[in-house]
Structures are given as structure tokens and as C-alpha cells.
Amino acid sequence: MNFIVYPALDIRNGAVVRLQQGDYARQTRYDDQVLPRAQAFADSGATWMHLVDLDAAKAGGYTLAPLLRQITRATGLQVQTGGGVRSRDDVVRILDAGAARVVIGSLAVRQMACVIEWLQAFGPERITVALDTRQDAGGVWRLPVHGWTEVAEATLDVLAQQYAAAGLRHLLCTDIARDGMLSGPNMDVYTYLRALVPAVQLQVSGGARDVADVVAAKMAGCAGIVLGKALLEGRLALKEAVQHGSVADPGDPLPCGELTEPVCRYRSV
């Protein structure tokens, strides 16, 4: 597998921020140097990045299209991005702005039929379903939505299997309890998902702190890992993470989910 390291930037009010456990009241603001940070990702060997519109995740209406255009044109990075994607027009607009994949979160939980239609229309390489999860007292993996302010009735295992059956290729799963905490990813949930939906390319998100976490995600058979706070706070060197992620492993169980063809435009879809 060609394991992908996704350096991440979460944007709120034009600034790079991080939330702790998805709580908008527990925010750390870093700076407004989004484009220089993206260029630094590319200079460190990253080929992809993960870009999140936190304002839109809460209120709807993706707002980062101009910034996305700047990033893709200036850096050559392939970008998967989301936050507040509520309609087909949102998907088209984001793809036309240069995204390689559109990340769909809350809507993927609330309106599965709609998202499956987009998978068929735009192709499974253009859609990443993001299931942000939190384990309840009974051990069930629940799915908070709308900026993690509400909890859906559906559960992680059920939705993952339904999307896999519909042809989903890219699934990003965030354990909210680990997000922004630098406590290491909860590999139990990813191992569980790998066994449950083995044909899906699984991305690890939440808690990554060092190279060992990158290696653990790769060895678990995941397709990639999203790195946020550890990079922003200088605890992890992206170049080193990319190097460890790219080491060949003859036991890799799945082919690469990395995009190889040029990004298309979808006005005619």
C-alpha cells in the first residue's frame, strides 16, 4: 500500500486553529499563515493535505474555495477538504476550486442516499466520507454531527458497512476523544473497522503524536493518517512522518487509494 500522510490545517475565521475533542470553546489559535504552512507541507515531501472549514462545519456553506485555489496552484498539493458540505452544488464548487477529494461528514450521516448518489456521479475517488465518532458508556461508537454538537441515531459500524456496500472507497474516521489531545490514535477502532470493511481505504485521525503512531497506522493496514496538532506544535517532523509512511511493506493488504489522474472539472455532471 502507498500509505498517505495528510498534514492538516483546520481554519476558523481565517486562522489556523485546533479544537480539543471537537469543542469550539476549547480552541488554540496559531496564526493566519495558511499558504506558507501548506507550502511547508509540500517542501517536507507531502503530496496531500487535509483542509477543514470549521466555520462551515458548524454553520454550513463551505467558505474556503478561494484559499483552496491558492493552495493547489501554489504548492501542487492534492487536497481533500470539507466542512459544511450540504449540497451537490457545494461538491461541484469545491471540486472546481481544485480539490482532489471532497470530505463529507454530517450529511453522510444524515442523508446517506444523497451521498451515495454523489459517489456514483463524481466517482469514489472524489469523495471521502468522514465519520467522527465517540464511544458511549455502553461501548457503542456513536456519530456526533454538525460540528460535533449533536449525536445521530445511526452507529459507526452500521454506516461503515452500508457505505462499503455502496462502493465507498475512502473513509476518514476520527475518534473525537483523542482529537487534539496528543494521546495517540485509538487503534482499536481502526482495527475493528479494517476487519468490518476491508475493501475501504481507511484514514486514521485524532491523537497522532509521533512517528510511532504513523507506523502503527500503516502496520494496521490503514491507507493513511491525518496529522494536525503534533505538526503545529513541532512535536513531529512532517518529513520524518512522510519517510516512515512511505517505507515499503510487503505485507500491505490493500492497493493505494492515492489519486494518480489529473483533477477533473464537474460543471457538466
UniProtKB/Swiss-Prot annotation:
SUPFAM superfamilies: Ribulose-phoshate binding barrel
UniProt-listed GO biological process terms: L-histidine biosynthetic process; L-tryptophan biosynthetic process
CDD domains assigned: HisA (cd04732)
Subcellular location(s) of the protein: Cytoplasm
UniProt KW keywords: Amino-acid biosynthesis, Cytoplasm, Histidine biosynthesis, Isomerase
Keyword Glycoprotein: no
Annotated signal sequence range: none
Keyword Isomerase: yes
Active site residues according to the UniProt entry: D10 (proton acceptor), D132 (proton donor)
Cellular component GO terms held in the UniProt record: cytoplasm
Chief place of localization: cytoplasm
Record's catalysed reaction(s): 1-(5-phospho-beta-D-ribosyl)-5-[(5-phospho-beta-D-ribosylamino)methylideneamino]imidazole-4-carboxamide = 5-[(5-phospho-1-deoxy-D-ribulos-1-ylimino)methylamino]-1-(5-phospho-beta-D-ribosyl)imidazole-4-carboxamide
Pathway where it operates: Amino-acid biosynthesis; L-histidine biosynthesis; L-histidine from 5-phospho-alpha-D-ribose 1-diphosphate: step 4/9
Entry's Gene Ontology molecular function annotations: 1-(5-phosphoribosyl)-5-[(5-phosphoribosylamino)methylideneamino]imidazole-4-carboxamide isomerase activity
EC number of the protein: 5.3.1.16
HAMAP family membership: HisA
Family according to the record: Belongs to the HisA/HisF family.
Designated name of the protein: 1-(5-phosphoribosyl)-5-[(5-phosphoribosylamino)methylideneamino] imidazole-4-carboxamide isomerase
Organism, as annotated: Xylella fastidiosa (strain M12)
